[in-house]
Amino acid sequence: MKYFLAAILVSVFSSISLAQGEDSTKYERDEMIISEFLPGIYSNYNQVYFNNRGKVPDEERHLRREIEVQEIETNIFSVKDTFVMANIFEKPITEDDKKTSHAIINVEANNKDKAVQLDIYKSDESYSLNDIDGSPDCTVMMIRGAEEFYARESSGDCDGMTNVYTLSKKHLFVRMDKDSGINTKEPYKLNEARPFQCYVDIPGVSGGRDLPYKRYEPFYIHDQGGTFEILTDHEKRNLVFRLVRVDWEINNHIGVFTRDVMVLYAEERTDEGYKINGYTFTEPDITRVGINFKWMLVSCFMESNKFATPFM
């Protein structure tokens, strides 16, 4: 009898084992995660700030860089890669100050080579899928780490491309070009940015000034150094506002661990130079922040009060 039961159990478990025909490979699963992580706006504002604060030699400093990734089709993404060649503290940033390239990334599990393959193709702002008919300009093989994916190897002519180094839910690191002219192998460290909308009221609440009220809006920026400027109607003041989610690379006092913050700066261009009127800081993951100086109020938010759900 016990042999009969054993035979039945073997038969049942064998059937269960053989029934797993829908299992994917782990690289096919990783392909889905990478395709979920990739879209977004990324900026290395934080890296540039701490290069300056840490007095990194000029020849080793990274340029300001922003990368925008959007899904075109399943597993196919457009890449707008922009270097900002001017300093926001010296002049307003214009399109002439930007050097932009375009690419298309195709994401595909490579079970044979045990990785997720990123094929990167040069493109233009039209992002025509005809650009990916031939061989890729650069190929990066991504494998999974503890909390991120990293490039095991790359091939092709990857200089001048968005040569992905690591990718997580919160960041995109890009390998330094060999002919960049910058004397460092440290990658470009771009943090994912969140979109915000802002407005400015002049005067602000309890302003106490005899000026006609005006709201300047809307302005769309992000929280990785996103900036907008206004010229006020009556006093002709050139006000600048900047939103930064600070990812501290250092501690700002000996013996303490400095926690990340969200900072909203209120600044101004004057005949005497660039000045900071003030700033506020709070927890890094908040979705709205504001300052009221009375003579001026600025508010930035991810969701407008126009669309907020009423509550008690």
Question: What function would you assign to each model-found segment?
Answer:
Residues 4-13:
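Sec-dependent N-terminal signal peptides
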Residues 17-21:
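Boundary at the C-terminal end of the N-terminal hydrophobic targeting segment
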Residues 23, 27-34, 39-78:
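Short, solvent-exposed loop/hinge segments that bridge or flank secondary-structure elements
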Residues 31-39, 45-52, 81-312:
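Calycin-type beta-barrel ligand-binding domains and close structural analogs
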